[in-house]
Amino acid sequence: MSIEQQALSGLKWTGSARLIGQVLSWAVTLIVVRLLAPADYGIVAVSAAIISVISTVAELGLGASVVQAPALERETLARIAGLAIVLNWSLGAVVALSAPLAVVFFGDDVLRRVIQVSCLHFGLAALSIVPEALAYRTMNFKWTASIDLIAGLVASLATLLLALKGAGVWALVLGSLAGATVRSALFLGSHPVRPVFRFGGLRGHVAFGGTLATSRLAWHVVNQADVFTAARFLTPSAVGLYSVSLHLATLPMQRIMGIVNQVVFPTVARLQDDRPRLRERLLSGLRLLAFVSVPVMWGISAVAPEIVALALGPRWHDAVYPLQVASLLIPFKMASAVISTAIVGVGAATLDLRNTVVNLVVLPSAFLIGVRWGVDGLVTAWALSLVVVLALTVPRSCTRLEIALLDVARSLRDPLLAGGVMYAVVLAGRAALAGVPHVYRLATLVLVGAAVYLPLVSLLNRTIWADLRRLRSASRA
């Protein structure tokens, strides 16, 4: 099977597993949420926030270094596995011993015990970091997707059974641990690595992984900066308005890019020594991503008044402008995310960190200025600062990937032109349907948008459907 076929198979299997797992998770959550108290979810949310940040440090990007490395010896893998165990178990012990501080800050002794038990995740993760990385390195996406689905199913069922037994908050904690245990066991069983606790010769892996881990920690700050700024200067209702608007706008991106990046990273790592082929595949991927993301996200922006009215209700009318603005920028953010994943895939972790620092400087500064004009000012600052960040980071990323910026622009051009016409037609259609009920107006505008976009993008790029058929055939091979 060619690398292209493996990548397409990965998208198919990963996407299918994510969809099935998400549906099952939602179904179980709807039952469990009626059995537990809101405080139970609050305690677990605080614990999860702490564990997730420390886990980024403990993992130290070692898994990514295994996937990205051009060549690896068995002894090196064994040493990386040993280092992963030492780091995770040590930091897990530190967090567990520091858990009593949670009582001081939050005044809840249950949180202390939840954090301490949740630290078992560090021990489980340590055992599977290298085996999981090996599975992705070999691009065995069918197996990785199956493991994630099985582990998610176990976690959901364990949580449900424990909740039915009256376990309270421990249903969430132990259910998550059950899924993590199964996940680690399956990866370890399929790609066993015996750890060696000698760490010589790992400087390159530690440098790459440490840089990547630092970048991830910085992204934690960047991703929360707007909400923290809003919480400091705006009312709680305004914060809720902003966060819900951004959540709606970024939800498609989170779902799609979680799948795409999981496949893009190992694929780029495999192609890093064949730059012409990498360039061709990356530009093709950006073109197809824009073909899908532009009509979806610009469509959401165009019909934002109807979406807000039907999904959120009249009290959320002020969410229309934030949703419109944010949705317009998401296709560019998605393309940038693919490029960012690609530069890590070719080993340029330092450049990824430099790009993250640009985000860390520009975005929070813009938020502090924009928040003076409330929610609309904050989302406008988000959009304008994102344009600045892309202008500063994308050109140098393309240079590192040996891809001309003009070629990237050409790959996005046709969907953007068709999307722009679609947007204008939908806005004109809304004016013509001003007196029609929201639900009928929304359905009509969606159909009008599709009727405009699909023929126009086909006219601008006559090969797009042939490309899609070719990819579909390759994914079945």
Positions of predicted regions on the chain:
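N-terminal membrane topogenesis motif
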Residues: 1-26, 67, 72-82, 111, ...
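Hydrophobic alpha-helical transmembrane segments
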Residues: 112-119, 147-192, 204, 208, ...
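Transmembrane helical elements of multi-pass membrane transporters/channels
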Residues: 10-25, 172-175, 179, 183, ...
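Specific pore-lining/lateral-gate transmembrane helices of multi-pass inner-membrane transport
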Residues: 68-84, 241-357, 470-473
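Interhelical loop/hinge segments that connect adjacent transmembrane helices in multipass membrane
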Residues: 1-3, 7, 142, 146, ...
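Signature of the first transmembrane helix
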Residues: 3-62, 87-101, 116-121, 151-160, ...
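Membrane-proximal transmembrane or re-entrant/amphipathic helices at the cytosolic face
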Residues: 395-398, 403-408, 424-477
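Membrane-interface junctions at transmembrane-helix termini in multi-pass inner-membrane proteins
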Residues: 4, 8, 68-73, 123-147, ...
